[in-house]
Curated annotation (Swiss-Prot):
It comes from Aliarcobacter butzleri (strain RM4018). The active site is at C16. GO terms for molecular function: ATP binding; magnesium ion binding; selenide, water dikinase activity. Binds 1 Mg(2+) ion per monomer. Synthesizes selenophosphate from selenide and ATP. It comes from the Bacteria. This is Selenide, water dikinase. GO terms for biological process: selenocysteine biosynthetic process. The keyword Translocase does not apply. It catalyses: hydrogenselenide + ATP + H2O = selenophosphate + AMP + phosphate + 2 H(+). Keywords: ATP-binding, Kinase, Magnesium, Metal-binding, Nucleotide-binding, Selenium, Transferase.
Amino acid sequence: MNNEYKLTKFVQAAGCAAKMGPGDLKQTICHLTPDDERILVGFDTSEDASVYQINESQAIVQTLDFITPVVDDPYIYGQIAAANALSDVFAMGAEVKTAMNIVGFDRKNIPKDALEMILDGGNSKIKECGGVLLGGHTIESPEMYYGLSVTGMIHPNEIIRNNTPKIGHVLVLTKPIGMGILTTAIKRDLLELNLIKDCAKIMASLNYLPSKMMRKYEVSSCTDITGFGLMGHALECTNNSITLNISHNDVPFVKEAFDFASNDVIPGGTRRNMKYVEDKIEFLPNVSDIYKALLCDAQTSGGLLIAMKKDDAKEFIKELEDYSFGYASIIGEVIPRTHKAIIIN
């Protein structure tokens, strides 16, 4: 792992922890009302990507995402940023077709050869899922950021939404949480190299395989977990008819993230998430403040949160384990609406 460039030292916040908080974002875009009957999925429902119908059998899925460095290795940072951007297409159940680079380059602190490695890392992930890089746009910036604009394709009848989970379905999370806390620890030089490598491997792994595998089953909803944390994105999956009942002990997380959170190594994005969800979620008394921070932790390139039948979920998890994707767990269930959108027990 190449740490000589110290990419994380020249940014205020790492990765998706730099994301604008969900409350502020909603206020900012609420007046934007695109009107076109071919828009199958817009930004009015907090979906992962937008979908625009081309004809009876084809729709394009569009998204973009870019992040500041979460690790110091340029190539791995490029991989993580690309995996994070591509994930929105996978969450919709779509296939990636093309991508374009989005770059803000900090020429003052970062050498040009590091940028070449970042772009190579990103391109490796685009190729891994069968996509093609078509170009991009680069500006000079006081802070480094990199990501992708991504276009995918899907049949209009096969779109997987995030806010349609069925009562009786269970919730599967495919990656452990805690990455916001751990990338903050990286930025503060608190993490040992072996743990940095483990975190980087998790963040750089694509959600492509879980996305392809879940399509074999009856999936009622799916989203990916990124800057708003598990709780923020789970809230986007709720509606007036259902409540998500989640067991905090069943949520996979990286152990060291708990330890760092206990020592107040908590990113600002995570604190904003905690503030946003506090009146929307019931945390039962057995859920500690440290677990609350973990559940709200701002993830970068997190896993998929999928609602599906319990028997299917068990088979799905076993399939992922067979492909060495061993973090997936059933973390809760969808129940009829109670007094809160989410209950954490």
